[in-house]
C-alpha cells in the first residue's frame, strides 16, 4: 500500500477566527511534530496533514470619493489545531516534506507582496487586490500539488532534496518581501 501525505491549503481572511492558534512563518523557527496538535483522521490514507495558508487583508483610503491610498497585510500562517500526524508512521523526512509545504506558502506570500508593491492607488484597487489574491492562491495550489506529485509525497527523496533546494533559492530571490 502506498502511503500518502495530505496537504491542506487554508485560504483564510483576517478576522475569520481571532481565537484560532496560528504560527507565522519564520526563517529561524522550523516546524516540529509538537506543532501538529489536531487528532489524526483515522479514515485518511495520509500520515500527516499540514494546514497552512496565506492570510490577506486590506484597507482603502478615500478622499472626496477618490481612492488616495491603500494598505495591505499578507501573512503566511500554519494552523497547529488543524494539523496532525500519525506518530508511529512519521519520520524526519516526512517532517521536512511538511515544512516545505509551509515554505512554499511563504514563497507565494512573498510573490503576493511583490506584486502588491507594484500597484498604485486607483478606483479599481479593490478589484486588482482581489484578483491578485485569487491568482496567487491558484498558483500556490498548483505548486503544492506539483510538489506532492514530483516528490511522491516525500517518498522520492531525490526529488524532495531538489524541491528543498529550489524553494530555498526562490525564497532568497524574494528576500526583501519575507514575512517579518
Roles of regions detected by a PLM:
Residues 1-23:
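Bacterial Sec-dependent N-terminal signal peptides
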Residues 20-68, 78, 120-180:
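Metalloprotease/metallohydrolase-associated module, dominated by Zn2+-dependent proteases
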Residues 90, 103, 107:
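Short, well-structured alpha-helical interface segments that form or flank functional binding sites
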Residues 95-104:
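Active-site His/Glu-centered metal-binding helix of metallohydrolases
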Residues 107-116:
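Membrane-interfacial alpha-helical segments at the cytosolic side of multi-pass membrane proteins
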Amino acid at each position: 500500500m502506498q502511503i500518502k501525505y495530505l496537504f491542506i491549503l487554508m485560504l483564510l481572511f483576517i478576522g475569520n477566527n481571532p481565537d484560532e492558534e496560528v504560527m507565522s512563518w519564520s526563517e529561524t523557527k522550523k516546524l516540529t511534530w509538537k506543532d501538529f496538535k489536531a487528532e489524526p483522521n483515522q479514515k485518511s490514507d495520509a500520515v500527516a496533514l499540514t494546514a497552512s495558508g496565506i492570510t490577506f487583508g486590506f484597507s482603502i483610503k478615500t478622499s472626496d470619493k477618490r481612492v488616495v491610498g491603500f494598505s495591505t497585510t499578507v501573512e503566511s500562517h500554519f494552523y497547529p489545531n488543524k494539523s496532525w500526524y500519525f506518530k508511529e508512521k512519521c519520520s524526519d523526512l516526512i517532517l521536512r516534506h511538511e515544512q516545505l509545504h509551509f515554505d512554499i506558502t511563504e514563497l507565494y506570500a512573498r510573490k503576493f507582496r511583490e506584486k502588491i508593491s507594484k500597484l498604485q492607488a486607483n478606483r479599481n484597487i479593490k478589484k486588482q487586490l482581489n484578483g491578485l489574491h485569487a491568482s496567487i492562491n491558484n498558483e500556490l495550489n498548483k505548486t503544492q500539488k506539483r510538489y506532492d506529485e514530483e516528490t511522491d509525497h516525500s517518498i522520492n527523496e531525490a526529488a524532495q532534496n531538489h524541491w528543498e533546494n529550489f524553494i530555498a533559492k526562490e525564497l532568497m530571490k524574494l528576500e526583501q518581501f519575507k514575512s517579518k
